[in-house]
Amino acid sequence: MRTIVIMVTFMFCINVIINSQNVMKHELVKLPYAADALNPVISKQTIEFHHGKHLQGYVNNLNNLIQGTKFESANLELIVKESDGAIFNNAGQILNHNLYFLQFSPSGGGKPSGRLAQAIDAGWGSFENFQKEFEAGGMGVFGSGWVWLASDNAGKLSIVREGPAGNPVTKGLKPLLTFDVWEHAYYLDFQNRRADHLNSLWKIVDWKIVESRYNN
């Protein structure tokens, strides 16, 4: 009898291990730059709170929420496309922030080149016109949200405004560039000056990253 109990316990433990390996555990994205590298556009303090606290909280929440659901082994983009409620909100925030933080570089700035530059010129006439429209899109988000540069399957670009956790993937579009207009993204550095926050972000955009998203 004791042998049977031991064997049952052993098999249960094996199943737990196997099942746990099949569950996708989402992790906090690692930044490719130091916390103070984007200063003064984004301060070290903002990075530490925005990335280390806010984003970590979304990651923790999502990992807890998807346990026992059909999303527990799904990738982030699929979760955002197919979920709703709390799961969507946390997954959307993770996907958005991952794209946001990874598009920056302390040596960023300048202008895009190649196919992306051509597509921007085709859509807005010039890069400068695009910048103005993009910043206006960010200013037009009421409350918390995001402004995106996105492309369709044909490569045509559009500026998309989204709410708190919204992402263009839910519209069948490819997200290329995003500016976060949640207050926690800029209040420590710019207080209520959202326009200054938006305008300053161009200085740290890594266009090689944005171009790679467009070309892939």
Indicate where each model-derived feature is located.
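Feature for soluble, non-membrane regions of globular proteins
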Residues: 21-216
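Bacterial Sec-dependent N-terminal signal peptides
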Residues: 1-22
